[in-house]
Amino acid sequence: MSKRDFYEVLGVPKNASDDELKKAYRKLAMKYHPDRNQGDAAKPAEEKFKEAKEAYEILSDAQKRAAYDQYGHAGVDPNMRGGMGGAEGFGGFAEAFGDIFGDMFGGARGRGGRQVYRGNDLSYAMDVTLEEAAKGKEAQIRIPSWESCETCHGSGAKPGTSAKTCGTCQGSGTVQMRQGFFSVQQTCPHCRGTGKIIPEPCTACHGQGRVKKQKTLEVKIPAGIDDGMRIRSTGNGEPGTNGGPPGDLYIEIRIRKHDIFERDGDDLHCQVPVSFITAALGGEIEVPTLQGKAAIDIPEGTQAGKQFRLRGKGIKGVRASYPGDLYCHIIVETPVKLTEHQRKLLKELDESLKKGGAKHSPSTESWTDRLKSFFS
């Protein structure tokens, strides 16, 4: 099957400028890229993608474009003539999409064709108390950090020597690897994308140009921060490669288990034990809050599980306008290790209460009635 005209493939006139060619190619490549076309549309899209790639690689090269304009496909197809050299893999693709796909996959082109990479992000786990999380705090942390080697001033080469241009990639930092129909541009395995080879590495940094040290950072923990939240420290991650920007440091907050309170969002919960005498007769008890002590009036006849709400005694979250509440859950404590005299008094009380029936123990009486109905 005869090939379509390359200008027709890209949808541009024969006098199209380089910018018009690039714009047309980018539009087609984005439309027919394999990642965007799945299922039944995958095969036709792949053919369109290859066709557009080949057309752009020929027309974006001044020498190949001139040969194509004069001789047509025969001027650029090595299978149709003695070999003027065909398309060179993804060269045109990388040129047209370097700024898009480079960012997507973490790499970009620096000057001289060297791969520029953003540094990796780092993570740090910080333990704080509930009180510190509620009020906020400033803290110092020490993290491992890569710094420029003082011996070689970051060059990686032994003092008095210098790095040489990589002979494998000719300083570009990348090599062409053919995979079936495609030629894929990959990081040079010899120089690892730096474009340079160091014949005599610096003994202090072993040719890396940087050494690992401990760095102290001031961290501000905002009031109301919750467990699992992260604080980003911009630019304090690992340094980039070949002049790339550094990554970020993410500090993950872990709130230690508290002896009294449990946090639920901006609210706090605590279990408050009271004696069965206080629960029966009522009274005032003292409970702790993050702001200090508070009093609760226990009404007469309070049952286990009763919940008392203290408004505004919780935590004001990072994005909240008002603080949460404190919920006190009552636990009626049963006395233990009774003396004989105490046992006698309780038995007398029990007999007296039984005579009152539902008057004194409505829940027990109701439960007894339901049991009788169930077994009848």
UniProtKB/Swiss-Prot annotation:
Residue ranges of CXXCXGXG motif repeats: 149-156, 166-173, 188-195, 202-209
Cofactor names: Zn(2+)
Keywords attached to this entry: Chaperone, Cytoplasm, DNA replication, Metal-binding, Repeat, Stress response, Zinc, Zinc-finger
tRNA processing listed as a keyword: no
Biased segments, Gly residues type: 237-246
SUPFAM superfamilies noted in UniProt: Chaperone J-domain (SSF46565), DnaJ/Hsp40 cysteine-rich domain (SSF57938), HSP40/DnaJ peptide-binding domain (SSF49493)
Chain intervals for the UniProt region annotation (Disordered): 227-246, 354-376
Subcellular location: Cytoplasm
Binding site for Zn(2+) 2: C166, C169, C188, C191
Domain (J) ranges: 5-72
Protein's recorded name: Chaperone protein DnaJ
Organism listed in the record: Acidovorax ebreus (strain TPSY)
